[in-house]
């Protein structure tokens, strides 16, 4: 039986917003979310803009401290919650990652290998593996500032893989990409699932999530409103696709708003 690889319990993130007349209001961007992802599983986080997806993923990646709650990683028979130790097992892709434009993709990966304290030979071997998996060969020695959007995104993903993490957390990995670039990243995620990696990612593309994900978690206003397999969610709501599922759940919860 597959074990839970990443576990989050009751995550809350509260931000303070300044209102008129110097009044301050606390807003929960994430409001009591618990979840887990098993080894060899892809879980999609779906929700409209402002639902709390990016905040949630940043907390799961240990890049943002939660106001409440805990995130841990299970590696073998050990459960780890220390921030630094957890980060060593996570590859995080932001939806606005900025790369060093004057470096080539190869130079970037070599630099990261040094930062992670990897022996040079191990780094070079890992770069060759990553290059094949993500089809970087044709541009890996070109300066990043000269790459296309799709090539830059593949270089960004490569940056997350140098230290061979067990968990991938990707925020909108195919956003704004052409069909071929999106397909390459989707196939990459499928192949990594077969290798036993745990993948948690957010997307606005419902059809992509339906094709790719083993489970879906739908969130709105920082809360989980439903979760399950694509098939079970469609059966529950009697809808033909995830777009219809989400619309139905919003109506059921009575949380229709400007979205």
Predicted segment positions?
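Helix-to-loop junction immediately C-terminal to a conserved catalytic motif
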Residues: 61
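Conserved ABC transporter NBD signature motif
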Residues: 69-81, 85-86
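Conserved ABC ATPase "signature" region
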Residues: 110, 114, 121-139
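Conserved ABC ATPase signature
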Residues: 143-147
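Catalytic Walker B motif of ABC-type/P-loop ATPase nucleotide-binding domains
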Residues: 168-172
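ABC ATPase "signature
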Residues: 227-228
């Amino acid at each position: 039986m597959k074990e839970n690889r990443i576990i989050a319990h009751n995550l809350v993130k509260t931000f303070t917003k300044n209102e008129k007349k110097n009044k301050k209001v606390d807003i929960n961007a994430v409001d009591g979310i618990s979840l887990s992802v098993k080894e060899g599983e892809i879980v999609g986080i779906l929700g409209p803009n402002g639902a709390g997806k990016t905040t949630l993923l940043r907390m799961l990646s240990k890049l943002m401290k939660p106001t409440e709650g805990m995130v841990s990683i299970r590696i073998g028979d050990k459960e780890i919650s220390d921030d630094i130790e957890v980060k060593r097992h996570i590859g995080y892709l932001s939806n606005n990652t900025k790369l060093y434009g004057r470096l080539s993709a190869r130079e970037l990966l070599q630099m990261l290998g040094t930062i992670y304290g990897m022996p040079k030979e191990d780094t070079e071997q890992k770069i060759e593996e990553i290059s094949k998996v993500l089809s970087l060969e044709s541009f890996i020695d070109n300066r990043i500032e000269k790459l296309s959007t799709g090539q830059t995104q593949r270089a960004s993903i490569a940056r997350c893989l140098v230290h061979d993490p067990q968990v991938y957390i990707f925020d909108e990995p195919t956003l704004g990409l052409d069909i071929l670039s999106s397909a390459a990243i989707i196939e990459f995620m499928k192949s990594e699932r077969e290798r036993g990696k745990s993948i948690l990612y957010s997307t606005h593309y419902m059809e992509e999530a339906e094709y790719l994900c083993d489970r879906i978690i739908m969130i709105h206003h920082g809360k989980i409103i439903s979760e399950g397999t694509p098939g079970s969610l469609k059966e529950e709501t009697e809808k033909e696709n995830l777009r219809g599922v989400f619309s139905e759940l919003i109506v059921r919860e009575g949380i229709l708003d400007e979205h």
